[in-house]
């Protein structure tokens, strides 16, 4: 339960504002239904943000099913063999984004573009903006971890 309205998760917290909730959900869903970047890669990036920000609520959330081994070894993405080069490029970009967006180098952007093109890079940046913002709101709202 959060301190705003007693909601237990993001959806129930936003429910009293149906216009906002519906528009946000449409935007959020669009990331999982686009053709430029694999949804499983976006989920890895979203989960990595949850790890970095220590958000149990966002870590427990499942927006896209991913390989259990990847989830288990996400903190070791740079060295674990289960991650592809494309996933590594996106995860490295995600970590820098989380720490200091101004520190994102041309090389990091080019690494993502090498796998996903310009449209994939734009999709990643837009998704990270939403994921990072929602992770920070989960912490601010003090949302609890919810089993799905």
Residue ranges of predicted features:
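Hydrophobic alpha-helical segments
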Residues: 1-148
């Amino acid at each position: 339960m959060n301190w705003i309205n007693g909601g237990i998760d993001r959806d129930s917290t936003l429910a009293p504002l149906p216009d906002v909730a519906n528009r946000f959900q449409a935007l959020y869903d669009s990331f999982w239904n686009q053709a430029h970047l694999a949804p499983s890669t976006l989920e890895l990036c979203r989960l990595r943000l949850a790890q970095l920000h220590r958000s149990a609520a966002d870590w427990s959330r499942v927006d896209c099913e991913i390989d259990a081994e990847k989830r288990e070894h996400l903190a070791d993405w740079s060295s674990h063999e289960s991650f592809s080069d494309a996933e590594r490029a996106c995860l490295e970009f995600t970590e820098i984004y989380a720490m200091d967006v101004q520190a994102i180098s041309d090389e990091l952007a080019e690494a993502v573009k090498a796998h996903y093109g310009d449209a994939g890079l734009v999709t990643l940046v837009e998704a990270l903006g939403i994921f990072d913002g929602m992770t920070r709101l989960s912490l601010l709202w003090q949302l609890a971890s919810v089993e799905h």
